[in-house]
């Protein structure tokens, strides 16, 4: 039984929670292809992206960000081959299956399981500030092969609109504001989460 006291941090729009020391678990991480949360917000009418595309993008961004921190991972194609016949249920249920399998057969010391809750691009070519891009995703690190929950983080960012102005001032503010895409926001989140993991080694 793990007895490490939970510890929370909040930085770069990331809320992170530690449940046990995670340093040794980062020796070789298996990254599970992200899930779309059951409450996924991705309506195309609202600037959203289909869940299968959103999860693919975030999985790739998080994987690349973790690799950039010098953390060894189980190659994505190797992981996919090992579990291609395992039906996916939910992130929480499958975490135990992946932790045991990746630990016993792929040499993983942990598995990172993620869910995308929102992946929405800005709407409106001239006034995107009314409907800005917004991304929310969360990850959980489990020890392998035992499946103990070690660490979790949630990234949540919606680009704020420029200050309220009127007339020509509003036009100038819109020109000065760089309207982020969902992809750019997700990239920032992936890098922030990878940075927190690297700091915990």
What would you call each of these model-derived segments?
Residues 1-5:
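Sec-dependent bacterial lipoprotein signal peptides
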Residues 142-194:
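Short secondary-structure boundary motifs at beta->alpha junctions and helix caps
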Residues 125-130:
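Outer-membrane beta-barrel translocator domains and adjoining extracellular loop/strand segments
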Residues 73-122:
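Short, solvent-exposed, polar/charged sequence segments at loop or secondary-structure edges
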């Amino acid at each position: 039984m793990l007895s490490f006291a939970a510890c929370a941090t909040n930085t770069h729009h990331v809320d992170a929670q530690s449940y046990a020391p995670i340093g040794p678990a980062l020796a070789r991480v298996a990254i599970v292809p992200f899930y779309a949360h059951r409450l996924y917000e991705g309506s195309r009418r609202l600037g959203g992206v289909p869940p299968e595309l959103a999860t693919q993008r975030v999985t790739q961004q998080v994987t690349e960000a973790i690799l950039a921190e010098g953390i060894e991972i189980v190659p994505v194609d190797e992981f996919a081959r090992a579990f291609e016949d395992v039906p996916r249920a939910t992130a929480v249920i499958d975490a135990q299956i992946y932790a045991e399998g990746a630990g016993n057969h792929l040499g993983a010391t942990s598995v990172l399981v993620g869910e995308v809750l929102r992946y929405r691009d800005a709407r409106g070519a001239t006034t995107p500030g009314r409907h800005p891009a917004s991304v929310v995703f969360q990850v959980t690190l489990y020890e392998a092969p035992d499946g103990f929950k070690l660490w979790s983080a949630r990234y949540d960012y919606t680009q704020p609109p420029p200050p309220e102005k009127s007339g020509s001032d509003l036009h100038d503010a819109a020109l000065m504001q760089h309207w982020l895409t969902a992809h750019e926001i997700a990239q920032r989140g992936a890098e922030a989460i990878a940075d927190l993991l690297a700091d915990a080694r």
